[in-house]
């Protein structure tokens, strides 16, 4: 959470862009990562991330603090935007048929080659999971969100999220094993 | 992918810089270089003729580019203080054009190796001298065209100060005063940074430093306007209808 | 690296700073409408009454000012246009345009081959523009491309 976040949110709800700016600066990278892991392409991730924050700013007047972090609200918007993104594409994407270049990730350009290759394999495998599994992996294992917050974002009970993350990791491991063979 | 649409003014500004890059029919293509290679296959005299022709055209284009920059520079509307800076930059562009003239004179009597040496020297000279000069001219043009923004911002600040004072007398919230104080600091910062940019031109500081100062001053202005917007939002909630 | 270690690496992915800056600017340029609050609590209702009272008082000031009921010297003439969002927006946009222009440095325009401006529209990253602009806009065929003066000099030095 950002220092003085509650005051910033209150001011942002009142329409003060000078308050929304710091919120954007703080949360944009994590929303970008969440989206990028799901969609794989930097340009798409940038477009969707932009839409997330635009939607957040346009609707900030209706935001009400209910004991959950501001980031939860942003993640929920991001999940919806990714769904809309795929709907707009209007086609079933078969991973086998995709040009590997589609998944080239300039965002990982600063990693060493072997790490980049490993990450790309894992990212492709994550992209093959169902959306809920993708979400729980990003939220719990990449962003280290507490169980309570992840449950709020995913609109599930904490128990359901615990079960889901276990299944998601198992499924991911199975897919990576399949890739290897 | 989204992109920003800029009004024609931006196009005119960038167009003037890009026109300098390919002024007055100065379009050199990769096939021009290929033609030199092809001429080499026909013999030394053919190659020499091709090299001299392309080198002459290239240096003439470089001179035309400098001339175009100078024309744009002299077309800027500047205050008396800024005329000194403009004159300095214009003189340096004259020096550049004189240099190109001297190099052009050498081309006619040069052999193949001679043309290669001239090309190499002009390339190196541009890297060490001309490119910095062109960058500084671009910076100065940008700076001159930004000056009215500072005047407008100051006028805006004065108007906002009036309305905030008026509302305070009528019992309005203190947060208006806090936002106004921030705006005042930001506008002052912007003006100080703008002055530093002017001094950077006078002191012939490196173009990247000058550009950084210009960028900082514009960012401070932009931040001041965020505060104006915040004040506007509060005032609009206090005054439900526009008079 | 095991799977969990690899997943942790994803946390180091960062968005492109130029995109972040442009996106931020575009988003903050949008002006949201002030919220209409649904007043349920007594506290909010009371605050609304106070605000309404202040608004009535201020409106009264304006009416009296306009009708000249006050002697002029004590009060500064107030221009509502000082905080008019439309004019603020126009001025802020002019500044944002200059910032964008400042970001297109001479070094960028020096290294690209074929930056074109069409009807005053800036084509984002000039490097991107030069690689994606249709060749028709450059007036060249697929086989040739326009080169810079420096590129020509380099070619001739060999």
Language model regions located:
Chain B
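Generic detector of well-ordered alpha-helical segments enriched in charged/polar residues
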Residues: 56, 70, 90, 119, ...
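Leu/Val/Ala/Ile-rich N-terminal alpha-helices, chiefly Sec-type signal peptides and the beginnings
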Residues: 21-125, 194, 205, 230
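Solvent-exposed, well-ordered amphipathic alpha-helical segments
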Residues: 45, 52, 59, 150, ...
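Extended amphipathic alpha-helical interaction segments
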Residues: 93-204, 238
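Amphipathic alpha-helical coiled-coil segments and their boundaries
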Residues: 37, 41-44, 48-51, 55, ...
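A cross-kingdom marker for long, charged
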Residues: 204-243
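Sec-dependent N-terminal signal peptides of Gram-positive bacterial secreted proteins and lipoproteins
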Residues: 1-21
């Amino acid at each position: 959470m950002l220092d003085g976040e509650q005051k910033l949110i209150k001011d942002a709800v009142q329409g003060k862009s000078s308050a929304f700016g710091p919120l954007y600066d703080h949360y944009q990278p994590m929303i970008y990562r969440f989206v990028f892991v799901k969609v794989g392409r930097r340009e798409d991730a940038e477009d969707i991330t932009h839409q997330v924050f635009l939607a957040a700013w346009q609707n900030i007047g209706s935001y009400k603090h209910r004991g959950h972090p501001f980031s939860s609200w942003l993640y929920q918007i991001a999940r919806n935007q990714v769904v809309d993104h795929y709907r707009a594409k209007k086609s079933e994407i078969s991973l086998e048929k995709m040009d590997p270049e589609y998944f080239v990730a300039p965002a990982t350009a600063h990693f060493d080659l072997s790490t980049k290759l490993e990450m790309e394999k894992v990212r492709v495998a994550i992209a093959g999971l169902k959306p809920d599994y993708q979400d729980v992996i990003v939220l719990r294992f990449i962003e280290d969100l507490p169980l309570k917050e992840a449950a709020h974002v995913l609109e599930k009970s904490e128990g359901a999220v615990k079960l889901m993350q276990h299944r998601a990791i198992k499924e991911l491991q199975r897919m990576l094993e399949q890739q290897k063979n | 992918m989204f992109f920003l649409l800029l009004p024609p003014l931006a196009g005119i500004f960038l167009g003037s810089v890009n026109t300098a890059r390919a002024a007055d029919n100065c379009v050199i293509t990769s096939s021009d270089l290929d033609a030199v290679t092809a001429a080499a296959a026909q013999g030394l005299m053919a190659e020499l003729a091709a090299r001299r022709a392309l080198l002459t055209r290239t240096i003439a284009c470089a001179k035309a580019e400098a001339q175009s920059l100078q024309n744009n520079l002299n077309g800027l509307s500047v205050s008396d203080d800024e005329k000194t800076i403009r004159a300095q930059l214009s003189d340096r562009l004259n020096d550049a054009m004189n240099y190109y003239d001297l190099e052009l004179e050498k081309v006619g009597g040069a052999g193949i190796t001679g043309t290669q040496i001239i090309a190499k020297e002009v390339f190196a000279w541009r890297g060490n001298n001309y490119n910095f000069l062109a960058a500084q001219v671009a910076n100065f043009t940008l700076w001159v065209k930004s000056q009215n923004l500072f005047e407008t911002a100051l006028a805006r600040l004065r108007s906002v100060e009036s309305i905030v004072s008026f509302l305070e007398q009528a019992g309005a919230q203190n947060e208006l005063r806090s936002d106004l104080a921030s705006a005042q600091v930001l506008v002052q910062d912007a003006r100080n940074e703008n002055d530093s940019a002017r001094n950077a031109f006078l002191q012939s500081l490196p173009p990247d430093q000058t550009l950084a100062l210009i960028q900082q001053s514009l960012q401070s202005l932009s931040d001041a306007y965020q505060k104006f917007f915040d004040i506007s939002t509060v005032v609009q909630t206090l005054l439900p209808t526009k008079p | 690296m095991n799977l969990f270690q690899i997943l942790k690496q994803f946390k180091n992915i960062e968005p492109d700073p130029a995109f972040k800056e442009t996106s931020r600017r575009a988003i903050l340029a949008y002006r949201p409408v002030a919220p209409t609050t649904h007043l349920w609590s007594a506290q909010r209702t009371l605050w609304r009454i106070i605000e309404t009272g202040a608004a009535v008082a201020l409106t009264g000031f304006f009416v009296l000012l306009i009708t000249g009921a006050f002697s002029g010297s004590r009060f500064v003439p107030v221009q509502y246009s000082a905080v008019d969002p439309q004019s603020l927006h126009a001025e802020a946009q002019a500044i944002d345009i200059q910032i964008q222009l400042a970001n297109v440095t001479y070094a960028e325009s020096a290294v690209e081959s074929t930056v074109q401006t069409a009807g005053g529209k800036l084509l984002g990253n000039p490097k991107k523009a030069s690689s994606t602009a249709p060749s028709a806009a450059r007036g060249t065929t697929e086989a040739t491309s326009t080169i810079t003066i420096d590129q020509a000099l380099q070619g001739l030095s060999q």
